[in-house]
Amino acid sequence: MKIVLVGGGKVGTALARQLSEEGHNVTVIDTNKARLEHLSESYDVMGIVGNGSSITTLSEAGIEEADVFIAVTGSDELNLLCCMFAKKAGHCHAIARVRNPSYSHELDFIKKQIGISAIINPEMAAAREISHLLRFPGASKIDTFADGRVRLIKFTLTDAQELDGVAIHEIPTRLKSDILVCAVERAGDVIIPNGNFVLQTGDQVTFLATQEKAHAFFQRIHLAVRPVRNAMIVGGGAIGFYLSQELLENHVRVRIVERDPERCNVLAESLPEAQILCEDGSNREFLLSEGLESTEAFVALTNIDEENVLLTLFAKKHSNGKLVTKINRLEFDDILAGLDLGSIVYPKYMTCDYIVQYVRALQNEAGSNVKTLYRILDDRVEALEFTVHEESRATGVSLSRLHLKKNTLLCCITRGNEIKIPRGGDQIQVGDNVIVVTLEHGLHDLRDIVED
């Protein structure tokens, strides 16, 4: 497909790389010539220097022939304006990143009035992910499928779980747990395991289950399942605001540490039930005096990655609470993974994943399209949910006779209200939603999981 992308920052660069690698014709518009030259040299994309809200620039980029238009500049208003002009000049799907909380209640209205196909708010998505983690603190990462009914959950295996030396096929009978282990990260390698795979202490284990069955499994392996009752949040920006709203609605006591007095006033007016502490979050004595040692969750959400890392390491030293760290830059995720920072949340990854998911869904509207996409375990594994629209070589065949591609696991079938971890005798039917975990990148259709 032909894709026009406005904004060559971190998110724009990640999108340009991913979409070009998947074979799309990508044109990037940005006002920074040096940035575009770097993009064009690094990836198979074309760069155009100019303003994305200029009809002349859009025409030069080929907006009339574009299938998808994406605006991810640093300005919400510019993104919306670019999409509006793109819709007027062409006949494409338009996607805008909009981050300001003041627009949060008007997104549906904006979509209808401008004709935008999708609006992405990465800060709101990040807050929702953190909220899930604080409701299920034993997990280090949680992704949701089937409209929230199915969870993909990651945790670190320690001696306390007593699973060292246990084969995966033993888990259902040994622990009376109906879960499916989908991926394991061990010593830097990622494995899509079979039933004979033996777990070891230190493994990063990702499994799939309904919320109720995940809860029961965590109880049996002695991992925390009780939602946190109080949280200390350092950083009162958009994510801190959205997160506090969600936590307060769930009766969690919230303390926000924010250094900007004006922002503190805004937070105090908007979140009267939260305790707003106007102080520098890097003041260690202050954090300790405000009960860091007894807090059940510590969330570092400042705008500076290095500060968030140091704050979390300090909190880890003084608290046994759930730790969550926000990271903006995508380049150092492999290094951060070795620091044991608790749960790490990347808002920019969420934006990329959503847009790639949307683009893949457009490509296969007839057969089976991608409904949900997550890239997990340092971007090395894709977890996808497909909606099956018509019969294919993947349907009507017992799974035991379906020859899946190497390092691909069919994890779950949802059929109406039924959620099933499939066995060899099960079949995929038209109308099903199917969840797949794979080391393969770029799958667009359910048929892609079957060997030719």
Which residues are covered by each model-predicted region?
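Cytosolic regulatory regions of ion transport systems
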Residues: 1-452
